[in-house]
Amino acid sequence: MIFFISDLHLSPRSPGATRLFLQFLAGRARQAEALYILGDLFEAWIGDDDIDDPYHAEIIAALRDASAAGLVISLQHGNRDFLLGTDFAAATGIRLLSDPYVLSTAEWQFVLSHGDALCLDDAAYMAFRNQVRNPEWQAALLAKPLAERRAIAAHMRQVSESSQQGKENPYTDLQAAATDDFLREHGYATFIHGHTHQPAKHDHIVDGIHVERWVLADWHEDRGECLVWDGEALTREALTLKNRP
C-alpha cells in the first residue's frame, strides 16, 4: 500500500493535528510501504537550524522512528514549508521530492504535486510563490538570525490570516487550461495534489483520454485523511484521534 497526505499545517497552535499525525506515524502508516507528504507538513518552517526546537524535535523523532521501521517517507515542499532542507531530511530519514514528481508503480502511474503552481488565476498568490521559491530570496532570508526569521514568519502568517477573513475558502482552484496542459505533459497520469483544501475527485477528458485528479484533504484538530493506493484503486481513509491510554 501507498499512502498520500498533505496540508497538515502542523504547529504548536495545532496540538490535536500534531497528536493525530504522531499516532498515524506510530500506527496505521506503518502498514504501508511508502508515505508521500505532498506539501505543507508544517504551518511554517524557517530553516533547518530550527531543528532542535522541542516541538520540531518530537515530530522529527517520530518521522525518524517510522523511517527506521521500514516506512519509506517522501516529502514535497508546500507554500508554508518551502525551506525544509537536507539537514531535515537527514535527521528524519525521509527524502525530499521534486515538484512535480512522477511515481510509477507496477500497476499504475501517478504525478504528484503540492498543486499551488497551477493556481494561475490568483495573481497575488503567484507573485508570492515566485518570490519565496527564488533561491536568492531564500538565501537572504536564511542569512538572517533565527529570531528575526521567527518574527518574519509570524508577520507573514498574520497577513495571510487577515487576507483570508470573510472568505468561505481562501484557496483558489487550479486553472483548468493549465491543468489540462499539465496532465498532457505528464502522459495523462493520475494526478494527486493538495493545497486547495477542497478534497474531491475530478474527472478530466484531455485529448479524448479520461484522467483522474484527486485533491487531498487538509487536516484539522480532530480529524485528518489519507489517500490509499492498494494496487488496484485509490480510496480515502478518515483518520481520527484515539483516546489517550
Feature map (PLM): residue ranges:
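A short, polar/proline- and glycine-enriched secondary-structure boundary/capping micro-motif
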Residues: 15, 121-124, 245
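Conserved beta-sheet core of the metallophosphoesterase superfamily
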Residues: 91-98, 109, 116, 121-127, ...
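Core catalytic region of metal-dependent phosphoesterases/phosphodiesterases
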Residues: 10-105
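Extreme N-terminal starter segment of soluble prokaryotic enzymes
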Residues: 1-3
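Short, solvent-exposed aromatic-acidic interface loops
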Residues: 237-245
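Active-site-proximal loop/helix segment associated with metal-binding centers of metalloenzymes
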Residues: 115-175
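Active-site neighborhood of phospho(di)ester-bond hydrolases with catalytic His/Asp-centered motifs
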Residues: 5-6, 35-39, 72-79, 97, ...
